[in-house]
Amino acid sequence: MSNRQTGTVKWFNDEKGFGFITPQSGDDLFVHFKAIQSDGFKSLKEGQQVSFIATRGQKGMQAEEVQVI
């Protein structure tokens, strides 16, 4: 079981449905809108603080179970 981490949204493109999160330590992580845990429109804004679980995806590290904090 992975530990939750925190980070900052680097950027997120609503039209394409993905972006990147800069964790407190380590390299930037890919984030897809399906990984965002919220009701309604799933989006993030640049500079938002988030918590997430880092997992290895097909193309590298990505954020899952993303929550705005």
Swiss-Prot record:
One Pfam assignment: CSD
Superkingdom of the organism of origin: Bacteria
Gene Ontology molecular function: DNA binding
Entry keywords, A to Z: Activator, Cytoplasm, DNA-binding, Stress response, Transcription, Transcription regulation
Localization: Cytoplasm
Domain CSD: 7-66
Expression triggers: In response to low temperature.
CDD domains per the UniProt record, alphabetical: CSP_CDS
InterPro entries: Cold_shock_CspA (IPR012156), CSD (IPR011129), CSD_CS (IPR019844), CSP_DNA-bd (IPR002059), NA-bd_OB-fold (IPR012340)
SUPFAM superfamilies: Nucleic acid-binding proteins
GO cellular-component term (any): cytosol
General function of this protein: Affects cell viability at low temperatures.
Full protein name: Cold shock protein CapB
Organism the protein comes from: Pseudomonas fragi
Name of the gene encoding the protein in the UniProt record: capB
